[in-house]
Amino acid sequence: GSAFFNAMAQKLGPLMFFMSGGRKGDRACFGAAQALDILGLNYASSRYDADAEKYPNRMMVGTETMVADLPYNWERVKKYPQLIGDFVWSAWDYLGEACIGDWTYYSYHGLPLFAGQGMIDSTGKPLAAMYFMQIVWGLRKKPFIGVRPLNHAGESPSTGAWQFTNAVDSWSWQGYENTLAVAEVYADAASVRLLLNGNEVGRKPVKRYRAVFHVRYQPGTLCAQALDENDRVLSEHSLMTAGQETYLTLSPEKTKLRANGQDLCYIPIEFTDGNGCLKPWIEQKITLTVHGAAARLAGFGSALCKTDEIFDKTYHDSYRGRALAVLR
């Protein structure tokens, strides 16, 4: 089915890119392009340059692409007026096509459930890829720092092509002091300077809106400065370590429900410090109790792609310090 072909496409990525731009791809597209106002292309961005030259009146749109290819694709969207847009798969994570995008660690047990390829996870939290896209699109001027999970340092994940990173926007990894961290910085700049507690860790050129640093974890403030060609600071972004105290923080989206049996209230549940700073290394079981006859628990879970837990139970493990409950 679909999951099988997606898995094959992941393995054959470079070959698929080459083949979609070849003569067979041209013949396959020709009839459809003649019949349609706009030709939709899935994972065929290798066609953009040649088709724009060969068929200048052909309207095209990238109907399904990978986030890692966005810098290449968006450059061509801006260049060719007949290429009207690019749709990255996918915005919100979903059930099915299980784990084809997830960066799976073997220490996680359970059956594959979510696809793991959304730019927003199943609990509604924007992931690093979302901020990367905003920077490429020109919607975010500040750089963004993402840190690969230190609670899995030393493990080699099974990666998926549809999710180009598993970095999280946190510098809170209690118990992992001196562990070598991988920090990814996304920026629309000539170079990036990374500082830890005011001390320069390194400076790197930005390639395809991305620079990667290796730094030993120490609590404090991790700051990325986006620099122009003359080393002038354009903007910066910082991550701060959470405090020692830990709270289980519930943040309901609303406090009143209509008594119609259909109204829902989504409640993010997070392990935080007193200022609401998330602690993503905390992954432990949470048990909920709903009091009163007017409401019931409609669902409870986390964004973990592999789990044997189900959504209609009152207990669930947090994932990256977070879970989501839904009241009806």
Describe each PLM feature range.
Residues 1-15, 301-316:
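Acidic/polar low-complexity surface segments
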Residues 1-262, 274-278:
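Substrate-binding clefts and catalytic carboxylate motifs of secreted carbohydrate-active enzymes
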Residues 205-211, 306-324:
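Aromatic sugar-binding surface patches on proteins
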Residues 218-220, 284, 321:
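A glycine-anchored, Pro-Gly-centered beta-turn/N-cap motif
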Residues 245-250, 288-306:
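Short aromatic-acidic-glycine turn motif
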Residues 267-269:
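Core beta-strand segments of extracellular beta-sandwich domains
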Residues 280-286:
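Short, ordered, surface-exposed loop/turn motifs in non-cytosolic proteins
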